[in-house]
């Protein structure tokens, strides 16, 4: 685990974005942990979040021309990541996001920001079912751009309805790499370093055993 990944876990714990306990997911599964990126909700949170996304993007080595943030959660993430790339990595990358509703005046259309072209890095919080990715792919392809990769905060590394995770399905269907700041394996490695979290470690490992990929 790299230092920025450990720092991200601590950041998520401090903001109660990452919690341990008993949680019922939309899938109906009982999960021993829960991740709610919506609780990164202050200016400082967003500034730090952008730095973690930028760090993981640069670390991945994936080549891209533009950041795309799908409405709505992806919009602030794309914005803060673009700022962090410029401020901390000397990479001035254009960004773009979509509107849910098309507009018939002003800029018009359903895209805001730079023209959607070239190799696109899609940034979002998490991938649960992959539905948002499919919707974004339609927009990207309609504009003649290509998907370079997908960047998220957490890869839960768990099976969907079949044998693959939602992330593995996205990688298979679109031939792109999904980059995550942290994965479930990173989370388990972090818990293993903390004796006071031994009970959470056992629960998360049991969950991985049952649902992991």
From Swiss-Prot:
Q: What is this protein called?
A: Orotate phosphoribosyltransferase
Q: CDD domains under this entry?
A: PRTases_typeI
Keyword list, A-Z: Glycosyltransferase, Magnesium, Pyrimidine biosynthesis, Transferase
A single GO cellular-component term from the record reads: cytoplasm
Q: Name one GO biological process term.
A: 'de novo' pyrimidine nucleobase biosynthetic process
Record has Secreted as a keyword: no
Q: How does it assemble?
A: Homodimer.
- Could you state a single Gene Ontology molecular function term? magnesium ion binding
Q: Which family does it belong to?
A: Belongs to the purine/pyrimidine phosphoribosyltransferase family. PyrE subfamily.
- List the pathway annotation: Pyrimidine metabolism; UMP biosynthesis via de novo pathway; UMP from orotate: step 1/2
Q: Where does orotate bind?
A: 34-35, 128, 156
- Enzyme class, broadest EC rank: transferase
Question: What SUPFAM superfamilies does the annotation carry?
Answer: PRTase-like
Gene3D superfamilies, A to Z: 3.40.50.2020
Q: Name the Enzyme Commission number(s) assigned to this protein.
A: 2.4.2.10
**Binding residues for 5-phospho-alpha-D-ribose 1-diphosphate:** 26, 72-73, 99-100, 103, 105, 124-132
Query: Tell me, what does this protein do in biology?
Result: Catalyzes the transfer of a ribosyl phosphate group from 5-phosphoribose 1-diphosphate to orotate, leading to the formation of orotidine monophosphate (OMP).
InterPro entries assigned to the protein according to its UniProt record, in alphabetical order: OPRT (IPR023031), Or_phspho_trans_dom (IPR004467), PRibTrfase_dom (IPR000836), PRTase-like (IPR029057)
- What HAMAP family has UniProt attached to this entry? PyrE (MF_01208)
Query: Which cofactors does this protein require?
Result: Mg(2+)
Catalytic activities = orotidine 5'-phosphate + diphosphate = orotate + 5-phospho-alpha-D-ribose 1-diphosphate
